[in-house]
Amino acid sequence: RFVFQSEVLFTTGSADLGGEGKTQIIQLAGTLKEIIKKIPPKIEWILRVDGHTDRVPIQTSRFPSNWELSTARAISVVKFLVGQGISPTNLAATGFGEFQPIDPRDDEIANLRNRRIELKLTQR
């Protein structure tokens, strides 16, 4: 499992990968390629890219809710991984909005922890 805080990858309220975010995902793609080489061919696997937000409401024309923002961020990461040579047949993007927090508190530290992208390599 890989976890990236959203602030490393995106600016606030955006689903566009920033420069640092692209650098991080390029490094991740390199690591993934090494891991993928070791997976036996008959094992069907998938890398799930999960977008998560904090509980602060967002309501813009592009992102009417945190579900849209979290999903758009996951899709951005998936598309970038495809551009780095990871097969799209082994990728899935999901958005959880604010509904799967890792920190249930209602403060800025919790918000920071809850804004994240999680990547999980699992058997299909």
Tell where the protein language model's regions lie, with residue ranges:
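Charged linear interaction tracts used for macromolecular binding and regulation
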Residues: 1-2, 23, 37
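Extended, gly/pro-poor, charged amphipathic helical "stalk/hinge" elements that serve as dimerization
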Residues: 1-9
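Periplasmic OmpA-like peptidoglycan-binding domain that tethers envelope proteins to the cell wall
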Residues: 9-27, 45, 52-124
